[in-house]
């Protein structure tokens, strides 16, 4: 029976026919072997091309090993508390490769080496960077730096996760000394958040600023999404809900409508519908009544539809006391529809750093919130201890 020159399966009847052919003509075997080899090599080459194309069309760009060693660090901050995608103290870097493409990455290595566990992300895959205060913080203020995904990666099936890390409101004493941005400069003349935002501007990454014109200095409100408590931050071009996993980032240009619902004497809910997901209304509940005017003003500024009177999303209220005229207008003729606040069964993603919520009992959700709070308090204690150590060193220098 004819055997191909390489591992190449042939139907038995075809192999028998070829065997009969080259028995009749000895030269036929050489020609047939050459044809089989050509078919095998061509098929392998085509398979490799398809595989390479799948890689290009699939996940966001990643750095090759040959380029990793040639990265120039534009700006780095050592030993910062990363919140997302993993809760851990790491080092954050912004750099460029020889082609001029800019990248951002976190690493366990203080020299800026790319860590295999945390691949670098093309900065084009982030649409902006936001600097948000950590709410209800006692002691030294902390700010969360948020790299918001949704740039060139919007059409990619697996866009990058948000990158969130915390920095204290103090001089950037832990900035990486090898940063090109700091050459000839005293790093202590910069506050951490200012240095990071200047670095992002240096690589043309847009900065999302808070809407202080309407909200003043406190541009965030306490809210719930399902059983998950968090804060809604209102920026000039973003609305962000955080900081527990998953972080929600909504570009104002993608917001189709905002409506008010479940208005009570003390609280109200809002429903946000995005143009990219018109069939889904994201509800944020238990917002304090004092923020109604601010949110209404924000809606007017970004010119989105208010569908509070829409039959599909008509506000259901159980007003008990007299409210301002604009709130009464929303609740008109709906006082009889008393609807208690409903919590979604939305679970948070489990991983080694987060304890997911359970829809089975409020106790599990409370326990998760307590663990989250303990982790945040531990981070704050670390910052406070570092600040205390610095003060001791300073006193010794004076002595």
UniProtKB/Swiss-Prot annotation:
Annotated compartments: Nucleus; Chromosome
According to the lineage, what is the superkingdom? Answer: Eukaryota
- Looking at the record, which segments are called Disordered? 331-399
**Which keywords accompany this UniProt record?**
Chaperone, Chromosome, DNA-binding, Nucleus, Transcription, Transcription regulation
Give start-end positions of Acidic residues composition bias: 343-354, 363-399
Q: Which SMART domains match?
A: Rtt106
Tell me which positions the record assigns to the signal sequence.
none
Q: Does the keyword Hydrolase apply?
A: no
Q: Which GO terms describe its cellular component?
A: chromosome; nucleus
InterPro entries, per the entry: PH-like_dom_sf, RTT106/SPT16-like_middle_dom, RTT106/SSRP1_HistChap/FACT
GO molecular function term, any single one: nucleosome binding
Family to which the UniProt record says this protein belongs: Belongs to the RTT106 family.
On assembly, the entry states: Interacts with histones H3 and H4.
Per its UniProt record, what PANTHER family does this chain match?
A: FACT COMPLEX SUBUNIT SSRP1 (PTHR45849), HISTONE CHAPERONE RTT106 (PTHR45849:SF3)
This molecule's function is given as:
Histones H3 and H4 chaperone involved in the nucleosome formation and heterochromatin silencing. Required for the deposition of H3K56ac-carrying H3-H4 complex onto newly-replicated DNA. Plays a role in the transcriptional regulation of the cell-cycle dependent histone genes by creating a repressive structure at the core histone gene promoter.
Q: What is this protein called?
A: Histone chaperone RTT106
Record the organism. Yarrowia lipolytica (strain CLIB 122 / E 150) (Yeast)
